Amino acid sequence: MKKLVCLIFMFLSLFQVSAHDFLRAVKDEIPGGYNFWVYTPVDYFYSQEQTPVIIFLHGASLCGRNLDRVRRYGPLDAIVKGRDIDALTIVPQNPGGAWSPKKIMDVLDWVKANYPCDTTRVYVLGMSLGGYGTMDVCGTYPDKIAAGMALCGGTSLKDVSGLGKLPFWIIHGTADRAVPIKQSKVVVDKLVDSGNDSRLIYDWWQGANHGTPARVFYMKKTYEWLFSHCLLDKDRPVNRDISISMSDTRRAYSDVNRNVPAPELIDGPSVIKEEGNEY
């Protein structure tokens, strides 16, 4: 894969072709691990080591072995709709059950070995089952993740102290019937009660159902907040200058550039059939 990346870079340099973004399906590269998408942004091959990494974890409805399904919502869908996300965007598929922090780190290790990137700016975000996965990954490997964001999730971790070691944002709707808000509140309460909440942001959206927070993935402010954090920041302070309210989500698509062509697909269909909002 490293040779492939180098060859593509040489091709772009020698022939001065127009910059383009690419979406690549990576399958069966990690024995017993997840299959996943790798999105490389425009101009990636000219600024590789400065490019951050985003890992998105989907909800239970997209579990399985059809990798195309995980493009239905989240950052990859936001990119197709015109949101500019200047990061290597990694979207694994969970075949079923809880997300495995170890397997997610195996994906990250594979990406680091095959795509030059800024390893001090790795971010994890997810929703529903992916919100659980996000808390589990960030709580287990806080020294490897620069910041995390969990929407309508929870955690399987008994010890949540790791979540207090990195900038972390939790959003949950009070009317969520799929994953009750208490699943997020118990995490917040543990961090607050232990005095380990200095890097924590949490928002309870009044009247929001399970699907409402999904629009966060389409908002510019989401990525501005993530990208403002770095492992090189000694004290790992959380950025509280950026806020996202439920009313903000109504304008989630207002500033996307719908004239931008979709990423060039290396493997997989160019259009995903719409089947409604499932998370």
Question: Which sequence ranges carry the predicted segments?
Answer:
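Primarily recognizes the serine-hydrolase "nucleophile elbow" in alpha/beta-hydrolase
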Residues: V111-N114, T120-G164
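A domain-start/cap signature at the N-terminus of enzymes
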Residues: Q16-V53, A87, Y132, V137-T140, ...
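Acidic catalytic loop of the alpha/beta-hydrolase fold
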Residues: A175-P180, G211
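Short beta-strand/loop motif that positions the catalytic acidic residue
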Residues: G164, W169-H172, D176
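Short alpha-helix in the alpha/beta-hydrolase fold that links the catalytic acid
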Residues: D68-V70, P180-K190
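Catalytic histidine neighborhood in serine/cysteine hydrolases
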Residues: L191-G211
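Active-site machinery of serine-nucleophile hydrolases
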Residues: T51-V53, L57-M105
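Gly/Ser-rich "nucleophile elbow"/oxyanion-hole loop immediately N-terminal to the catalytic nucleophile
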Residues: V42-E49, A98-S128
